[in-house]
Amino acid sequence: SGSKTAKIGDGCFGVPIDHIGSTTDLGCGRPRPKPTPRGS
């Protein structure tokens, strides 16, 4: 329920979880919000 495009694992699924509103553990096996790009 937010306009933030979080990515699951940032490399496992990488899909917008707009319909959920929170990062789920669908791909990596654990919830992981997308951190700020700091030289990634």
From Swiss-Prot:
Expressed by the venom gland. InterPro entries: Natr_peptide. Residues 1-40 are annotated as: Disordered. Keywords: Disulfide bond, Hypotensive agent, Secreted, Toxin, Vasoactive, Vasodilator. It is found in: Secreted. GO terms for cellular component: extracellular region. Disulfide bonds join 12-28. Residues 1-8 form a propeptide. GO terms for molecular function: hormone activity; toxin activity. Its main location: secreted. One of its GO terms (biological process) is vasodilation. It comes from the Eukaryota. Belongs to the natriuretic peptide family. This is Natriuretic peptide HsNP-b. It comes from Hoplocephalus stephensii. The lineage of its organism: Eukaryota, Metazoa, Chordata, Craniata, Vertebrata.
